[in-house]
Each structure stands twice: as structure tokens, then as C-alpha cells.
Amino acid sequence: MSEAQLELEVLSFFVRKPEITQYGTQTCNSNCTCTCVCTTRCSNNCKKQNWLRKFNSGYPIRRFN
């Protein structure tokens, strides 16, 4: 995934601002821990949330690669 694609992903994620998301019986909470093994989509969501956490705490965007 290129940096531009990532930024687009993150921006669209910002716009959606999903709450706790459930996929079947697999739930990721706001701390990105799951009640059972995360689905890929759930796991990717958590990666974005972790990235946003870094981004929001002043983590430079250019260092993410």
C-alpha cells in the first residue's frame, strides 16, 4: 500500500468514525482487543485505529512506512 493510499484510507476512516464494530461473533473493542481471533477486516480496523492514535498524539505521518 502506498503512502497516498494509506492517507486516503485514514482520511476515509476519519470521516466514517466507526464505533465498536462487530463481524459475526468477533468483536473488537476500542482498545483493539478482540473477544476471539479478529477477522482480517476487524484486524485492519484496529491497525487504522492504532495508527490514528499515533497520528492524534503528534506522530509524524511521514514516519509511517
Curated annotation (Swiss-Prot):
Superkingdom, natural source: Eukaryota
> What name does this protein carry?
Putative uncharacterized protein DDB_G0283559
Per the UniProt record, the source organism is Dictyostelium discoideum (Social amoeba)
